[in-house]
């Protein structure tokens, strides 16, 4: 019974994440927001089922890659970049503080540059001048830093309010 509940829970999280990404593709203004909301759903799966959250990431990435690319590929690409962070952050937080900051800096740099290159490959007209690469990279780095703070706040909110309100703690008993 417990395995079937876990599978159902993971399916629900995948469906909600896919809907967020579809909304981001339909309304292009919400592309980064939808990727971050889908990543927060991944955080819920990670907090409840630890290692099985990787399956949520993979299934959501495949599903969004199949149908979101028809509208706009940016939310799916941004989810591929932002979605990894809720899975990596607990591992980074277990390291010593200085090494953790170095690893976060490397992730921020790599993901912001990957985002800029992906945007250039998908929408080449958006990066016409060379200084636009730097502006986009700085903006994405700032978004990832704010996303790191959001993860900490959302995790606290999830444990103290949302988990009890949705009765998720009773779901796995």
Annotated model-derived regions:
Residues 45-56, 93-99:
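Membrane-helix interface "capping/anchor" motifs
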Residues 54-65, 100-110:
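Central hydrophobic cores of alpha-helical transmembrane segments
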Residues 31-41, 69-74, 103-113:
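Alpha-helical transmembrane segments of integral membrane proteins, especially early/N-terminal helices
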Residues 7-12, 36, 54-58, 75-76, ...:
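Hydrophobic alpha-helical transmembrane segments
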Residues 22-31, 61-91:
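Interfacial aromatic-anchored transmembrane helix boundaries in multi-pass membrane proteins
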Residues 10, 78-117:
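Short helix-perturbing small/polar motifs within transmembrane alpha-helices
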């Amino acid at each position: 019974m417990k395995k079937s509940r876990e599978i159902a829970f993971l399916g629900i999280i995948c469906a909600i994440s896919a809907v967020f990404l579809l909304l981001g593709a339909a309304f292009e203004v919400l592309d980064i927001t939808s990727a971050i909301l889908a990543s927060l759903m991944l955080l819920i799966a990670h907090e409840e089922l630890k290692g099985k959250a990787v399956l949520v990431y993979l299934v959501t990435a495949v599903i969004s890659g199949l149908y979101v690319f028809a509208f706009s590929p940016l939310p799916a690409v941004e989810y591929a970049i932002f979605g990894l962070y809720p899975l990596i952050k607990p591992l980074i937080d277990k390291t010593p503080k200085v090494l953790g900051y170095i690893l976060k800096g490397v992730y921020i740099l790599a993901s912001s540059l990957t985002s800029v290159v992906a945007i250039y490959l998908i929408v080449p007209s958006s990066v016409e001048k060379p200084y636009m690469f730097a502006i986009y990279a700085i903006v994405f780095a700032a978004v990832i830093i704010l996303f790191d703070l959001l993860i900490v706040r959302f995790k606290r909110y999830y444990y103290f309010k949302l988990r009890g309100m949705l009765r998720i703690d009773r779901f796995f008993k």
